[in-house]
Amino acid sequence: MDIWGLKIFKTVMEEGSISKAAVKLNCVQSNVTARVRQLEEELGVTLFYRKSRGVELTAKGEILINYANDAVQLLDNAFLAVSDDELVGGPLSIGTMESTAAIRLPELFYSYHQKYPVVELSIDTGTTEELVKKVLNHRLDAAFVAGPIDHVSIGQHKAFDEQLVVITERKIKSISNLDRPTFMVFRRGCSYRGVLETWARESGIIPKKIMALGTLEGILGFVNVGMGITLFPKSIVSNLRWENSVSVHPLPKRLGDTSTVLIYRKDRIQTGALKGLIELL
């Protein structure tokens, strides 16, 4: 078992197929297949279920991936520890909530790119729950999520203050007597969806149904025509120019006041690329 074999195994798991892993690793598919089989033979176990549309980890594969993540990260940390601290470059994978990507990150990353033009930046959007898991599993270097995050392995840096509001169609002037509205939200794991559900429960409001959509603009579009209500930072409405299309309604301070934090693993040596991002916050 060597580190390259573990890197191949890790990449196949992340990409969900041997062919996609080969593309990412810039090598031929037969080499990836051979290295996975070699690793399985060496360990005497099957690591992947082979399916028509990709692969899936077996129970033994689920065990090994944790050690593979740690081994690859340990090697990366060793490289960083002896490399030139003045050189700010290389890859930087950042996760973010969709709302943060829309209103907060464009200017931030424009400034970042001006200062660190050779950093290879990649952005992955998802829910807070999904992004926390990806940071913990070494699939992201850091992520912008709704904070604070209470986890022993997570470090965090406050990035933005936000005020959460309920957003309705324009003609609704009060949310005190909403009659079984439809909730227009992201999928489960979205922290703002959780706040909306908490507010509704405490206010005695029972939703008629919950519709999960995949985009911020889609949710606001449905709200605009009266299909339902949603909850997001107030800055969404002004920054995306929805002020004249929807109504915003404040929440009690304990629910409405929140912050977005940049999270990362405490045990990872911070690269110059990540340090540079934190310094801009």
State the predicted function of each range:
Residues E42-L43, L64-E86:
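Alpha-helical linker/hinge and terminal dimerization helices associated
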Residues T182-S203, Q270-L274, I278:
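Secondary-structure junction motif
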Residues K10-V28:
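Short helix-boundary/capping micro-motifs
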Residues G89-V152:
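Central regulatory/effector-binding core of bacterial HTH transcription factors
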Residues E40-L57:
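A short LG(V/I)-centered, amphipathic sequence patch enriched
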Residues H151-G189, G194:
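Flexible hinge/capping segments at coil-to-helix
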Residues T127-V132, L136-L140, V145-A146, S191-Y192, ...:
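Hydrophobic hinge/microswitch elements
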Residues R104, S247-L281:
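A late-sequence structural motif
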